[in-house]
Structure formats: C-alpha cells, structure tokens
Amino acid sequence: MVNLGNDWDELLKEEFEKDYYLNLRKFLIEEYKTRQIFPNMHNIYEALKHTSYKDTKVLILGQDPYHGDNQAHGLAFSVQPQVKTPPSLLNMYKELKDDLGCFIPNNGYLMPWADQGVLLLNTALTVRAHEANSHKNKGWEIFTDRVISILSEREDPVIFVLWGSNARKKVELIDTSKHYILEAPHPSPLSASKGFFGCKHFSKINEILKKLGKEPINWQIENI
C-alpha cells in the first residue's frame, strides 16, 4: 500500500483502490522485475511526499520522468545531485536569471522548491530506461489528472504552471474562476525560444503569492 505520509493519503485513498490503479500496479510490479525503470521504485511518489496538499502553492506540470541513468528521482524537471543539468531545466535557469537575476547553479536538484510548496508533478510517474513516454496511457494520466482535480476543488488558490501543449490541455481540469493559470511553450530547446524565454513566470508566481498574502518562493537553487 502506498504511504505518502501526509494529507494526500486520505485524499487519494479511493484512487488507490480503483481498478485502473490496481492494473497499473500489476503492470509496474512486472516492469520493475523485468526491466530497468526510472525512478527508483521508492521515489515514484516523491513529489506528493514532499509537497503536501495543504502546503501546495504552485503546481508545475511535467510529462514523464527523465529516462537517462541516475537522473529521475520523482520530481518533475529535477535531477539527482551530481548529475548534469538537462537542457529543459537549464533553460528554466536561464529564464530565472533573466527574470529574477538568479545565478545558474551547478546542479539540477529542485528539492528546495518542493519544500517551499512547489508541487513538481509529472503526468506519468514512471518510464522505461532510455524510452521516452514508454509508460504513457498505462493509467498514470488518470491518477495525476485526479491530483490536479483535487487541487482545483480547493478553495485556497493554487497557481498552475502549464508549459507545452500536453500540459496546457490540463486546463480543462482546473476551475479558472478560483485558481491562477500560467501558460507558455515548453522550456525544451525545441520550443523555449517560441515564448518560454521572456515569460517571466517565476516573478509572476511571486507577485501572485504576495497578493494572496503568502510567502514568495525563493527560486535560487544553491550550488552543491
């Protein structure tokens, strides 16, 4: 049984008992037994474990985990310490530098964001090594859609950050009368120059948080 150790346990209890999830679980048990799967089995739910429902101020939506060795650890866009910063995250750092003057750190470990209430959620939480989107349409999207919907049902406003066409489709799950939506092209090198650079989302998030009377996010990731 999944134990997230915070308020998500109660909110997702019914989800973990649904047929689609039980089928997904069976599939994953077999996959982890017979193939190399990322992230490590114990890190699948890292995003939800580190950023509780109550503490979520911002949701940044990713797609599926990094599929290279030693990269993924359960937070969207983040990599383990001592691993080279991937291109999309490097572009996020470049935007942060232009937007807020942050220096570009020597690592891509985003746990400090998660600990401040930034839920770094991928739409699929697992992937086969070196095979992008290999766990697409296995059930994860139903599960992560439910996470988005649960946050949308909350009275306390959440800032939903949707980068790229896949993430932007999720806007239909969100009550836009209560919550804030920031949309832009994906920070990937393929699309960053089409409107991600210059979107100023990081400063916009902090402006909204201040307006809501909440502590802004310290976006600076320190060197390790």
UniProtKB/Swiss-Prot annotation:
EC class: hydrolase
One of the Pfam families matching this protein, by short name: UDG
Keyword Nucleus: no
Subcellular location: Cytoplasm
Catalytic residue list: 64 (proton acceptor)
Signal peptide from the UniProt entry: none
EC number: 3.2.2.27
SUPFAM superfamilies: Uracil-DNA glycosylase-like
Main location: cytoplasm
Claim: Magnesium is one of the keywords in the record: no
UniProt keywords, alphabetically: Cytoplasm, DNA damage, DNA repair, Hydrolase
GO molecular function, one term: uracil DNA N-glycosylase activity
Reaction it catalyzes: Hydrolyzes single-stranded DNA or mismatched double-stranded DNA and polynucleotides, releasing free uracil
GO biological process, one term: base-excision repair, AP site formation via deaminated base removal
Matches recorded under PROSITE patterns: U_DNA_GLYCOSYLASE (PS00130)
Highest taxon, organism lineage: Bacteria
Family under the similarity heading: Belongs to the uracil-DNA glycosylase (UDG) superfamily. UNG family.
Chain's role: Excises uracil residues from the DNA which can arise as a result of misincorporation of dUMP residues by DNA polymerase or due to deamination of cytosine.
Protein name: Uracil-DNA glycosylase
Protein's organism: Clostridioides difficile (strain 630) (Peptoclostridium difficile)
Name of the gene this protein is made from: ung
